[in-house]
Amino acid sequence: MSDEVQPGFVRVRLDLSYDGTEFSGWAKQAAGRRTVQGEIEDALRTVTRSGETTYELTVAGRTDAGVHARGQVAHVDLPGELWAEHQEKLLKRLAGRLPKDVRVWSLTEAPSGFNARFSAIWRRYAYRVTDNTGGVDPLLRSHVLWHDWPLDVDAMNEAARRLVGEHDFAAYCKKREGATTIRTLQELSLVRGDDGVITATVCADAFCHNMVRSLIGALLFVGDGHRGPDWPGKVLAVGVRDSAVHVVRPHGLTLEEVGYPADELLAARNKEARNKRTLPAAGCC
């Protein structure tokens, strides 16, 4: 994937939100499954009268089926003439064409070197769970997990602090051949709101598959007393998947925001993000 925009094209940044309940994830799939990418690309093709031509989106975070996004970012390269013709009315036309569970909030010409995926320096997710004896507020049922054991948020935060930093998160990721599982977890913290809903904030430079939901699964085991606060850190250190770590359900997870560097740093960030990371050797640094 090149960061160079082809001659005659304009790179456009999209800021968008969606309720993931009825989607089979972000990425287009076979067999006609409904996806966020598919809906937006279809709408874009229709409102720009592009016939059979599909302009493919690149996204900051490829969310799984059932996962929501409040602050997702994508980009698309459009022919300059098409962008000039439709720019002023494109946002409103998309609003009229897109289904109600996905919205595009802004369309802007991206700065040189911008790549929605590789330019990002952090992604921030929130996972919401309640241990309310009566269950989840019906109005929040598609966005909050119900855990039927009382949760000790202080114990969960104690466990979370031991996971922050640069580590190999292989124990919390679904393995992909040739892909690194080294990530820098910048924040992992939990707060109980006045309504009893516990919000876990999870921020990292990037995430591997199932990482956020696996981390939350481990912390829930600590919170309900089935494991001690040191257990998630021990699992991390072993470096292999532990069958006791559950991948929690997707509907409690929302991509809240994606961060990018200043425009002049985009090219360097793109190059850095493509490098396969390794941890320092033992005794080094």
Swiss-Prot record:
Substrate binds at residue 125. GO terms for molecular function: RNA binding; tRNA pseudouridine(38-40) synthase activity. Keywords: Isomerase, tRNA processing. It catalyses: uridine(38/39/40) in tRNA = pseudouridine(38/39/40) in tRNA. Coiled coil: none annotated. The active site is at 64 (nucleophile). Its EC number is 5.4.99.12. Pfam families: PseudoU_synth_1. InterPro entries: PsdUridine_synth_cat_dom_sf (IPR020103), PsdUridine_synth_TruA (IPR001406), PsdUridine_synth_TruA_a/b_dom (IPR020097), PsdUridine_synth_TruA_C (IPR020095), TruA/RsuA/RluB/E/F_N (IPR020094). The keyword RNA-binding does not apply. GO terms for biological process: tRNA pseudouridine synthesis. CDD domains: PseudoU_synth_EcTruA (cd02570). HAMAP family: TruA. Homodimer. Formation of pseudouridine at positions 38, 39 and 40 in the anticodon stem and loop of transfer RNAs. PANTHER family: PSEUDOURIDYLATE SYNTHASE, TRNA PSEUDOURIDINE SYNTHASE-LIKE 1. Belongs to the tRNA pseudouridine synthase TruA family. This is tRNA pseudouridine synthase A. It comes from Streptomyces avermitilis (strain ATCC 31267 / DSM 46492 / JCM 5070 / NBRC 14893 / NCIMB 12804 / NRRL 8165 / MA-4680). The lineage of its organism: Bacteria, Bacillati, Actinomycetota, Actinomycetes, Kitasatosporales. The gene is truA.
